[in-house]
Amino acid sequence: MQLIIVTGLSGGGKSIAIRQLEDSGFYCIDNLPAEFLLPIAENLEKNGTRAAAVAIDARSHATFENAFTALEALSQRGIDVRILFLTASNEELLRRFSETRRRHPLSTLAEHQGRELTLNEAIARKREIMAPVTETAHVLDTTRLLPSQLRRWVQQFVKQPAAKLTLTFESFGYKRGLPYASDLVFDVRCLPNPYYSPELRPLTGLDAPVASYLAQEPLVSEMIDDIAAFIAKWLPHYRGQNRHYLTICIGCTGGQHRSVYVAEMLGRRFADQAGTIVRHRALSANLLPENKLQTL
């Protein structure tokens, strides 16, 4: 059985993710107390469920101590367990709570316990509680994602087979800031920029004309080779840490041309060595065709 645990910061997008998983054919349970995870998962497997997703919202360190114990037991039973952790910047979380006028769960809990927590304090406390989870989870920063983009990325995550180590190559634009969840960051702003070619400016690194332009530049090929060599050298050491996910971010100025192309090429390079996911932070959902590089 495939089991996906959806968790993360309050306001990070867990509800959207769990709805997308349900639409993808998963048997979904929202807001499950961690102590019920093991018996429910065992029962689902016994009843022949092939794919299930459970959303867990931790409000104390003890919650995930129970969850980790359950996950170890499930893995020993041969159940394919993966954790999807959704996060966002403090500013974006504040905006989302203000927009929906909902109270943060930890603020409500603190009130019942006779204490007061501001929204900023509740968010900071939640980050502290959830920090250990990020070491074994696939972390997705939803700060600049539209709901449609988040649903698309969840679809991609589901399609990706489980592997001992999954590499995520993520392009981004420096003018919008670095992604929150990044293990390695490579700056490709020194490469020739298609933006200054009028016919290429409105296109992206997924378009064949831009890809052709960059493929003909020796510096681009050299940069890709150097990044690939670095990753290949250190990949065994990351595997040795029993990590499940490694996020490699590639940045250019706007996240539209160079970083997109380089991320795509690196994803192809490592497709045979690990599970790979390629995503492009700066591109809106309507600029993400299934495969614009098919002509290469």
Model-inferred region functions:
Residues 17-18, 263:
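Post-Walker A alpha-helix
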Residues 119-246, 271, 282-288, 293-296:
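C-terminal accessory "lid"/substrate-recognition subdomains
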Residues 7, 25-40, 274-285:
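Short beta-strand-centered segment that lines the nucleotide-binding/catalytic pocket of NTP-utilizing
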Residues 22-75, 294-296:
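Conserved nucleotide-sensing/catalytic segment adjacent to the nucleotide-binding pocket
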Residues 6, 248-252:
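Hydrophobic anchor at the beta1->P-loop junction of P-loop NTPases
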Residues 77-102, 140-143, 181-194:
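Conserved phosphate-donor/acceptor-positioning beta-strand/loop module used by diverse small-molecule
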Residues 1-12:
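Compact, charge-rich alpha-helical regulatory domains located at protein termini
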Residues 12-13, 257-258:
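Conserved glycine(s) of the Walker
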